[in-house]
Swiss-Prot record:
Region annotated Oligomerization, chain positions: 175-187
Organism: Maize streak virus genotype C (isolate Set) (MSV)
Lineage, broadest ranks: Viruses, Monodnaviria, Shotokuvirae, Cressdnaviricota, Repensiviricetes
GO molecular function, a single term: DNA binding
Ranges spanned by the short sequence motif RCR-3, renumbered to the chain: 100-103
The protein's name: Replication-associated protein A
One Gene Ontology biological process: symbiont-mediated perturbation of host cell cycle G1/S transition checkpoint
Record-linked Pfam families: Gemini_AL1, Gemini_AL1_M
């Protein structure tokens, strides 16, 4: 799992973590100590770090750290050291990763005792000690130890325990969700912050006129017998609108729809 190439939320969970620091000038011993300290919560057991030279002249650092408990982090910058950001992967085969790191190192540092990957029970019953069939507990322990994602976990269960997978899939899905919980994306406010403008008179007025004040001049003529023309009705309604707006501004609080409508019924125009 890389740390930056995907738009999906970052998540890393593995007892065998393979790190590559491009163009990092630090010594392998210093980087190893920093990584060891970063993983102290998961009880580090072994680390190896080596400097490798590329054909283009650039150098990088490779590191493999093994922990007693799987390293869990959703922070893609967790392993950053002095501004150097590594590529982060789960070492499915720590044996092969270690062989790669020790291939042609310019400098190498090692601490602890390397833990070879245990022989997997998945699909290997025909080789070696085939007389002893592993129990389901042993198979599941192996799957939990090596799976690095929800999809890989379910795929390994399906491959090694097909009958249980087909009859108890909902239980395996539940355990997969617990082992590899979905990462909640950080909330991004769709409304960018701006200078406070709580009144917004122009915008509110544009919405207020067609949505709240729905008294038509024709309806006003029916309610007010002293009003004799459409022009008089429009004039009265405009006066009511201005008066109500001034009262709201003076009181410093918004009037409710019901009180506005009641004011429209009781107040008389300037010609009444």
């Amino acid at each position: 799992m890389t740390s930056s190439s995907s738009n999906r939320p970052f998540s890393h969970r593995s007892p065998n973590t393979f790190l590559t620091y491009p163009q990092c000038p630090e010594q392998p011993e210093i980087i190893s100590q920093r990584i060891w300290d970063l993983c102290s919560h998961w009880t580090p057991l072994y680390i190896i770090c080596a400097r490798e030279a590329h054909r283009d002249g650039n150098q990088c650092l490779h590191a493999l750290i093994q922990t007693e408990k799987p390293v869990r982090t959703t922070d893609s910058r967790f392993f950053d050291i002095d501004g150097f950001h590594p590529n982060i992967q789960s070492a499915i085969s720590p044996n092969k990763v270690r062989d790669y790191i020790t291939k042609e190192p310019l400098a190498l540092f090692e601490r602890g005792t390397f833990i070879p990957r245990k022989k997997s029970f998945l699909g290997n019953s025909s080789k070696g000690n085939s007389d002893k069939k592993p129990s389901k507990d042993e198979i599941m322990r192996d799957i939990i130890s090596h799976a690095t994602s929800k999809q890989e976990y379910l795929s390994m269960v399906q491959k090694s325990l097909p009958y249980d997978w087909s009859t108890k899939l909902q239980y395996f899905e539940y355990s997969a969700n617990k082992l590899f919980p979905d990462i909640q994306e950080e909330f991004i406010n769709p409304h960018p912050t701006s200078e406070p403008d709580l009144l917004c008179n122009e915008s509110i007025k544009d919405w207020l006129q067609p949505n709240i004040y729905q008294v038509s001049p024709q309806a006003y003529l029916l309610l007010q017998p002293n009003c004799y023309s459409i022009d008089d009705a429009i004039s009265d309604l405009e006066w009511l609108d201005d008066l109500t707006s001034k009262q709201i501004m003076e009181q410093g609080s918004a009037a409710s729809t019901s009180s506005v409508q009641q004011g429209q019924e009781n107040l008389h125009g300037p010609e009444a």
